[in-house]
Design a protein with these regions (language model features):
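Short, acidic, Ser/Thr-enriched surface-loop or helix-capping motifs
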Residues: 297
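Radical SAM/AdoMet-radical enzyme domain recognition
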Residues: 66-81, 90-226
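Radical SAM enzyme [4Fe-4S]-AdoMet core and its adjacent flexible, acidic
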Residues: 154-162, 169, 173-285, 289, ...
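N-terminal [4Fe-4S]-dependent radical SAM core
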Residues: 1-27, 45, 75
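Canonical Radical SAM [4Fe-4S] cluster-binding loop centered on the CxxxCxxC motif
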Residues: 19-60
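Short cysteine clusters
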Residues: 34, 38-41, 284, 290, ...
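Flexible mid-to-C-terminal extensions adjoining Fe-S/redox cofactors in radical SAM and related proteins
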Residues: 309-414
Length: 414
C-alpha cells in the first residue's frame, strides 16, 4: 500500500488535486520477516541480502529515520507508510515509540500513517492503537475463500482466510479506517465480478494488484522469485495473464459503473480518471516519471523502490547520509526518469500512453513488435481496460468539468 492517506483518488476531488509530494518513503521495520509464506510474495526472499537474520529496526535508527524524513521532505503533509514483511511483528511498543518520535519532530507539519498488514496479528489492542493514532490500514485479502487460500498460507502451510476475516470484522467493529488490497492472480482470472461483489460487501475502498512473476526451481525448496532475465527463470504458475487481468478489471468496472460510482472506490478507476482529467495520479505506476517513493530497510539501507530492492539500486544508508540527499541524487533522479525515457517507441505512440505511461517498470520485461525491450507484459490487458472504459471516463471528465458529480455516469448504464 502506497503512502497517500486514503490510497484512492476520490472522484469528487479529482479536479482539485495538486502535485504529488516532493518525496515519500516506505519503511520496513522488520525487513522481509513475515508470519505468512504467500507463494507470490516478491519480498519474502529479500532476507538473503541480509544473511537470513531476524531483522528489527533499532530505536536509534527509528529516530534517525523519522527526523530525516520529516525535516528533509518539503511537503506539508508527511505520510509514513509502514510495510514488510509483516510490520506488526515489530510489536506495539515499537509503534508507540514511533508515534512519540513523530510528535517530537513534527513541528508545524501534518503527520499521517498508513500500514499494510496480512491481518493475522490484529487484535483489540492493535485496533485501539490504530484508531487512537488515525492509522489507515491496508488489509490483504484476495477475495472469496478459495481464491484467498490458493496462495496465501501461513508458514506451516495452513490457510488464512478465516483469520483475515476475523481481523476485518474486528476493525469494522472498532471503527478502524482501512481498505482492502487484493492481488489478481491465476486463481482469480475470470472471476472479476464475483471478487468485486464479495469485497464490496466488506469495504468501500479496494485496490487490485496484478501478479506477474518468474521463479527458479530449487531442489527441496520452494521456488525462488527471480528476474525474468535470469537463467532458468520460468513464469510462476500463480501469474495472471495480460488478457486475464484486463478482463478481470473490465468485469469489475462493469459492476462498479452500474451501481457504485461515488460510493465505492477502486484505485485503478480513480487513477485512470485522474489521467483523463490531466491531474497527476496519486499512484506512481501511472505517472510519467517515478522515484518519489524510496524504501528504508530495517538497518537503514535506502533503495530506489519497493520493487527494486537489489544491491544495484541501493542509494545509501541513513546512518551515513541524509534521505533528502539520496532522493536528489543522480541515481534516484535517473531511476525516475527512466520510467519515461526507456520506453519503446510503440509505447510512446500508443493512444493510451497518457493513461498508463507504461505502468510500473517492474512489469517491463516484454518486447515491442519491432523488438525493442522494456515493453510492459500487461500491455494487452491495459489496452483492453482503457478501450472498454473510454466512453465512461470521457463522460465522467465532462461531468467534473461542468461541476457535476461523476456519479451521473451511472445513467449511461440504465
Amino acid at each position: 500500500m502506497k503512502s497517500n492517506k486514503r490510497n484512492n483518488l476520490h472522484l469528487g476531488d479529482v479536479a482539485k488535486m495538486g502535485r504529488a509530494p516532493a518525496f515519500g518513503t516506505m519503511v520496513k521495520p522488520i525487513g522481509s520477516a513475515c508470519n505468512l509464506d504467500c507463494h507470490y510474495c516478491y519480498y519474502r526472499d529479500k532476507s538473503e541480502i541480509y544473511g537470513n537474520t531476524m531483522p528489527r529496526m533499532s530505536e536509534e535508527l527509528l529516530e534517525t529515520y523519522i527526523r530525516q524524513y520529516i525535516q528533509g521532505a518539503s511537503q506539508q503533509t508527511i505520510s509514513f507508510c509502514w510495510h514488510g514483511g509483516e510490520p506488526l511483528m515489530a510489536g506495539l511498543p515499537f509503534f508507540r515509540k514511533a508515534m512519540e518520535l513523530q510528535r517530537k519532530y513534527a513541528g508545524d507539519k501534518v503527520i499521517e500513517n498508513t500500514l499494510q498488514t496480512n491481518g493475522i496479528l490484529v487484535n483489540e489492542e492493535w485496533c485501539s492503537f490504530f484508531k487512537d493514532n488515525g492509522f489507515l490500514v491496508g488489509l490483504s485479502l484476495d477475495g472469496p475463500e478459495d481464491i484467498h487460500d490458493a496462495f496465501r498460507h501461513d508458514c506451516g502451510g495452513a490457510p488464512t482466510f478465516a483469520r483475515v476475516m476475523k481481523a476485518l470484522e474486528l476493525m469494522n467493529r472498532t471503527g478502524v479506517d482501512f481498505n482492502i488490497l487484493s492481488t489478481v492472480n491465476a486463481r482469480s482470472e475470470g472471476r472479476g465480478a464475483e471478487v468485486y461483489k464479495f469485497l464490496r460487501s466488506l469495504n468501500r475502498y479496494m485496490q487490485f494488484l496484478p501478479v506477474v512473476e518468474y521463479v527458479r526451481q530449487r531442489p527441496g525448496k520452494r521456488p525462488l522469485i527471480v528476474s525474468p532475465d535470469e537463467e532458468d527463470a520460468v513464469e510462476a504458475p500463480w501469474s495472471v495473464s495480460a488478457k486475464g487481468y484486463g478482463q478481470f478489471m473490465c468485469d469489475v468496472f462493469d459492476e462498479w459503473v452500474k451501481y457504485d460510482v461515488g460510493n465505492w472506490f477502486v484505485q485503478l478507476f480513480d487513477v485512470t480518471l485522474a489521467n483523463w482529467c490531466g491531474v497527476q495520479p496519486p499512484l506512481c505506476a501511472f505517472g510519467e516519471i517515478c522515484g518519489d517513493g524510496m524504501v528504508v530497510e530495517h538497518n537503514g539501507d535506502v533503495y530506489s523502490c519497493d520493487h527494486f530492492v537489489y544491491p544495484e539500486y541501493r542509494l545509501g544508508n541513513i546512518m551515513q547520509g541524509e534521505l533528502a540527499d539520496m532522493y536528489r541524487s543522480d541515481e534516484q533522479q535517473s531511476f525516475g526518469r527512466d520510467k519515461r525515457d526507456a520506453l519503446p517507441l510503440e509505447c510512446k505512440r500508443c493512444n493510451y500512453y497518457f493513461l498508463c505511461h507504461g505502468e510500473c517498470p517492474k512489469h517491463r520485461f516484454g518486447y515491442a513488435k519491432n523488438g525493442e525491450p522494456y515493453m510492459n507484459v500487461l500491455c494487452e490487458g491495459y489496452k483492453m481496460f482503457f478501450r472498454h472504459t473510454d466512453p465512461y471516463m470521457r463522460y465522467m471528465k465532462t461531468l467534473i468539468e461542468k461541476g457535476e458529480p461523476a456519479s451521473g455516469v451511472m445513467d449511461m448504464k440504465k
